[in-house]
């Protein structure tokens, strides 16, 4: 945790000002994530696989604003001594919430990767509520196992009167392992899922361009095939009529009848081909438009995930690097500068940004928010109503 001794030299007015702005951040985190949770409760249309993971993320970020920051303000700015029990509770809860937030981001990225790379299998095999709840619980269990046991065990390593920070802060290798589990692996996984999403989109876009006019090709091939069959049948009828010995009159009648039959056959085949071609062309155009809409939706999704990855890296990389560097110093001489405190706060700032990056960019959540605030889109007046009013 940040060095409380560095706040002793601050004036009371400065501390009150800082406490006010920190409280605003905590309130903004609670408000933004509470809206996401409320939207999930109010709107039943949100209760599908991806929205459950958004809910899990919002819960972890919400309690960052409820527990982590409110306990941090009096301890750091006003030198409130927690005591051992409250200190252990705060550390365990704070690390649990922040790590769960990170792992929920990984889970959401993985879910989006499955929906883009294999949409059919995603829709048919991943709809069970039990599987979704199992994944949500697994996030919290893994998040606790990363830091929780070490915080409890290393509490006996600390000296009396030391700061409220984990006892393993003086062991660089433990910090390296926890940073690897909290930051490095999640960043690699989220980057991997995003790259695969972009690769799948590129392949789909390339395939869509190559098959931009599949209906025209099918029509031309059908028409050519039926025309060829019509000509072939006419030739066969003509050759058959010349080979049969008969009188000149009967032969001429036979030729006329064969020509009329071949022309009718050709006209019927062309008519059938044109009808089949029109059906195949309309079906292919509709299919192409549907694929184009899905491709645009997937592109927007990929862009939002790319922004998420960048924000996540910016919010977590500085603190992970600082903790490893500070582990080489003793707790008394560690240079915990203002940059360390900024890096520390960036983790909590990520909990404020998450509801803006995820649900607020999701159309279903936007509709749910409009429902919460009782905002309805006003329909445009029709021409009939305008004429009546005039």
Swiss-Prot record:
Protein name, entry field: Histamine H4 receptor
GO terms assigned for molecular function: histamine receptor activity; neurotransmitter receptor activity
UniProt cross-references to PROSITE patterns, sorted A to Z: G_PROTEIN_RECEP_F1_1 (PS00237), G_PROTEIN_RECEP_F1_2 (PS50262)
Keywords, sorted A to Z: Cell membrane, Disulfide bond, G-protein coupled receptor, Glycoprotein, Membrane, Receptor, Transducer, Transmembrane, Transmembrane helix
Cellular compartments per GO CC: dendrite; plasma membrane; synapse
Pfam families (UniProt xref): 7tm_1
Record topological domains on the Extracellular side: 1-19, 74-87, 153-172, 326-341
Entries under CDD domains matching the protein: 7tmA_Histamine_H4R (cd15295)
GO biological process, one term: G protein-coupled receptor signaling pathway, coupled to cyclic nucleotide second messenger
Subunit structure: Interacts with TSPAN4.
Protein induction: Expression is either up-regulated or down-regulated upon activation of the lymphoid tissues and this regulation may depend on the presence of IL10/interleukin-10 or IL13/interleukin-13.
Species of provenance: Homo sapiens
Lineage: Eukaryota, Metazoa, Chordata, Craniata, Vertebrata
UniProt cross-references to InterPro entries, sorted A to Z: GPCR_Rhodpsn, GPCR_Rhodpsn_7TM, Histamine_H4_rcpt
Bridged cysteine pairs (disulfide): 87-164
Functional note: The H4 subclass of histamine receptors could mediate the histamine signals in peripheral tissues. Displays a significant level of constitutive activity (spontaneous activity in the absence of agonist).
Glycan-linked positions: 5, 9
Keyword ATP-binding: no
């Amino acid at each position: 945790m940040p060095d409380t001794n560095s706040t002793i030299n601050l004036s009371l007015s400065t501390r009150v000002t800082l406490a006010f702005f920190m409280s605003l951040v905590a309130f903004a985190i609670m408000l933004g994530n509470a809206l996401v949770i409320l939207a999930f409760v109010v709107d039943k249309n949100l209760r599908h696989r991806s929205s459950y993971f958004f809910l899990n993320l919002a819960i972890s970020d919400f309690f960052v604003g409820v527990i982590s920051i409110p306990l941090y303000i009096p301890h750091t700015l006003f030198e409130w001594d927690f005591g051992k029990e409250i200190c252990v509770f705060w550390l365990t809860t704070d690390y649990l919430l922040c790590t769960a937030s990170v792992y929920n981001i990984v889970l959401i990225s993985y879910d989006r990767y499955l929906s883009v790379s294999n949409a059919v299998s995603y829709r048919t095999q991943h709809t069970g509520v039990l599987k979704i709840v199992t994944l949500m619980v697994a996030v919290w269990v893994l998040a606790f196992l990363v830091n929780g046991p070490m915080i409890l065990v290393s509490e006996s390593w600390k000296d009396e009167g030391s700061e409220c920070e984990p006892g393993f802060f003086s062991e660089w290798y433990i910090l390296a392992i926890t940073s690897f589990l909290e930051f490095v692996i999640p960043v690699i996984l989220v980057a991997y899922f995003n790259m695969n999403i972009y690769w799948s989109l590129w392949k789909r876009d390339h395939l869509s361009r190559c098959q931009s006019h599949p209906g025209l090709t099918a029509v031309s091939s059908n028409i050519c095939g039926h025309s060829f069959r019509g000509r072939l049948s006419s030739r066969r009828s003509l050759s058959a009529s010349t080979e049969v010995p008969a009188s000149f009159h009967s032969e001429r009648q036979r030729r006329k009848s064969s020509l009329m039959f071949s022309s009718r056959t050709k006209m019927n085949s062309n008519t059938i081909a044109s009808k089949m071609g029109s059906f195949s062309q309309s079906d292919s155009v509709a299919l192409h438009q549907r694929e184009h809409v899905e491709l645009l939706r997937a592109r927007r999704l990929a862009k939002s995930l790319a922004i998420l990855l960048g924000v996540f890296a910016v919010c977590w990389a500085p603190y992970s690097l600082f903790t490893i560097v500070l582990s080489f110093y003793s707790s008394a001489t560690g240079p915990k500068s203002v940059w360390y405190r900024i890096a520390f706060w960036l983790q909590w700032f990520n909990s404020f940004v998450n509801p803006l990056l995820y649900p607020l960019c999701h159309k279903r959540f936007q509709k749910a928010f409009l429902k919460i605030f009782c905002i309805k889109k006003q329909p445009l007046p029709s021409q009939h109503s305008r004429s009546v009013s005039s």
